[in-house]
């Protein structure tokens, strides 16, 4: 099914490429045309980008920006195909780390280092820790647009009603979950119909249970083995939470379980800080992923990563494309992002008392103050390894695989990836 979908995407993009080759990136009236591709065809991001483009075009009447957007999972396939054509988008969305690095190694992304160096008024206003995940071999290839990280959300009203405190350790998390379940609440909302939600737990648990040097080696496509016992222990920890998740985790998606949390049917959810606005009006509290006895990784590391945009190495208009990205990541547009969308700009000082709640500002500070960041797991490893991991864990959650069996499948995928990387 996935191969058929990819075939259809290739066919459709090929037809568009043929059509695109007959036109010019500069129109007859002298305007420069830029193609802008992102992953938010739905509100509120859809209107946000349309309004940003409209304002930019008003200030730059010689530039016309054509927007195209597809949803998350479709985007991952389509952008890879589009960048392989002779008419790729000039500006395109990208997750950071390995997802972006593949495009860089494939010469699909423009080196933006000179823009960072020559326009420090712009580059210095970015949160510096958010630039690094788009940096490859000491060169900058992407512009961070928004910051995001994981945290446990909890319903303060439910916790106060049952006289519960936010857990600081794993044992306390289990104890709190037991008490919530005894009082008729679903302790933790979790939906894995779309498997990306699994990667957030796995990324965090691997960081806690496996030492950093081993993880770095295993996450590298050329050297990954995944034989350390910490990976099995991480999955066993996830298994310990299974009695406290909602029923049928593999049959429901994240949006559904988030709504369950919002309606007060569940008391906790491991969510992205960018989702705070989506669970209003819950009396919301947050706590970091609890410390685990015997863990090898730091509790001060935060799971999360920036998302941003890159410019195609094939663009005929790098200057104009960069002008748009600098406009998109200006302080004014960053403040608009926080206010209109509820996401957090990678521009410093954009979450204020005027456009963000106290807990949103707390979330931003949490990211800025983090000692280190743990990238989204499925964006930090080879896609074959990620698929083996997420499919295996989904089966484990359904009772069809053990942690050991999951890791055997991951080790097999890693071996194949190593062979192809040689």
Curated annotation (Swiss-Prot):
Main location: membrane
Membrane topology: Lipid-anchor
Record keywords, A-Z: Cell membrane, Lipoprotein, Membrane, Palmitate, Signal, Transport
Gene3D superfamilies to which the protein is assigned, alphabetical: Periplasmic binding protein-like II
Cellular component, GO annotation: plasma membrane
PROSITE patterns, per database record: PROKAR_LIPOPROTEIN
Residues in the signal sequence: 1-20
N-palmitoyl cysteine lipid sites: 21
Record's protein name: Uncharacterized ABC transporter extracellular-binding protein YurO
Organism: Bacillus subtilis (strain 168)
